[in-house]
Curated annotation (Swiss-Prot):
<comment type="function">
    <text>Hydrolyzes nucleotides into nucleosides. Snake venom 5'-nucleotidases are widely distributed among venomous snake taxa, but there is a lack of information about their biological activities. They have been shown to inhibit platelet aggregation. This effect may be due to the liberation of inhibitory AMP or adenosine by its action on ADP released upon initiation of aggregation. Venom 5'-nucleotidases are also known to synergistically act in vivo with other toxins like ADPases, phospholipases, and disintegrins to exert a more pronounced anti-coagulant effect.</text>
</comment>
<keyword id="KW-0479">Metal-binding</keyword>
<keyword id="KW-0449">Lipoprotein</keyword>
<feature type="glycosylation site" description="N-linked (GlcNAc...) asparagine">
    <location>
        <position position="46"/>
    </location>
</feature>
<dbReference type="GO" id="GO:0000166">
    <property type="term" value="F:nucleotide binding"/>
</dbReference>
<dbReference type="GO" id="GO:0098552">
    <property type="term" value="C:side of membrane"/>
</dbReference>
<keyword id="KW-0547">Nucleotide-binding</keyword>
<keyword id="KW-0336">GPI-anchor</keyword>
<dbReference type="InterPro" id="IPR006146">
    <property type="entry name" value="5'-Nucleotdase_CS"/>
</dbReference>
<comment type="similarity">
    <text>Belongs to the 5'-nucleotidase family.</text>
</comment>
<keyword id="KW-0325">Glycoprotein</keyword>
<feature type="binding site">
    <location>
        <position position="11"/>
    </location>
    <ligand>
        <name>Zn(2+)</name>
    </ligand>
</feature>
<protein>
    <recommendedName>
        <fullName>Snake venom 5'-nucleotidase</fullName>
        <ecNumber>3.1.3.5</ecNumber>
    </recommendedName>
</protein>
<feature type="binding site">
    <location>
        <position position="13"/>
    </location>
    <ligand>
        <name>Zn(2+)</name>
    </ligand>
</feature>
<keyword id="KW-0378">Hydrolase</keyword>
<keyword id="KW-0472">Membrane</keyword>
<dbReference type="GO" id="GO:0008253">
    <property type="term" value="F:5'-nucleotidase activity"/>
</dbReference>
Length: 54
């Protein structure tokens, strides 16, 4: 996994950890990563193959 910093509209920085939780095949047969985003230990979003790799 790796970390990045995002900037909120109120100028408060939050460290977000992106965790690769595997891969799955997209509609066209490609292997695409499935990742989860966490900030302060709270899951922000679970990205699907429809959002990653296109």
């Amino acid at each position: 996994s790796f970390e990045l910093t995002i900037l909120h509209t109120n100028d408060v920085h939050a460290r977000v950890e992106i965790i690769n939780v595997g891969s799955e095949k997209s509609d066209d047969g490609r292997q695409v990563p499935v990742v989860q985003a966490y900030a302060f230990g709270i899951q922000l979003h679970n990205y699907s193959s429809q959002e990653i790799g296109k």
